[in-house]
């Protein structure tokens, strides 16, 4: 019986509903202007800053990856790792080739 009463929440739910009713009514009543005010500034303001990921992510996303994103990803680690790897061994491996032109070029 007590569980049913608790589940039904006659006294607790009644109180909660009573408190929620006026709160919801007050929120709903003021919601007409309150939600419009906070929504207007929050929609354009918050979406511009926190939700701006949509706008900046779109243009900035492709711009970043296209410029620094793409080159840094494939070019940065790809080019330096690829050419630097074989270049380093090529330099010391073939010191006669680069040494000859480097020596006369330096002096």
Swiss-Prot record:
Cystine pairings recorded for this chain: none
Broad class of the protein's primary localization: cytoplasm
Tissue-specific expression: Expressed in prostate and testis. Weakly or not expressed in other tissues. Overexpressed in prostate cancers.
Keyword Cytoplasm: yes
GO CC, any one term: cytoplasm
Subcellular location: Cytoplasm
Keywords: Cytoplasm
Protein role: May be involved in growth and survival of prostate cancer cells through the TAF-Ibeta pathway.
Protein's recorded name: Prostate collagen triple helix protein
Gene: PCOTH
């Amino acid at each position: 019986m007590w569980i049913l009463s608790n589940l039904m929440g006659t006294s607790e739910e009644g109180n909660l509903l009573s408190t929620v009713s006026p709160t919801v009514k007050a929120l709903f009543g003021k919601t007409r202007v309150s939600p419009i005010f906070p929504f207007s500034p929050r929609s354009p303001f918050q979406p511009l800053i926190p939700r701006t990921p949509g706008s900046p992510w779109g243009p900035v996303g492709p711009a970043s990856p296209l410029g620094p994103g793409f080159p840094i990803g494939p070019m940065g680690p790809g080019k330096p790792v690829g050419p630097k790897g074989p270049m380093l061994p090529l330099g010391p491996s073939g010191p006669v080739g680069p040494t000859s032109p480097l020596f006369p070029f330096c002096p």
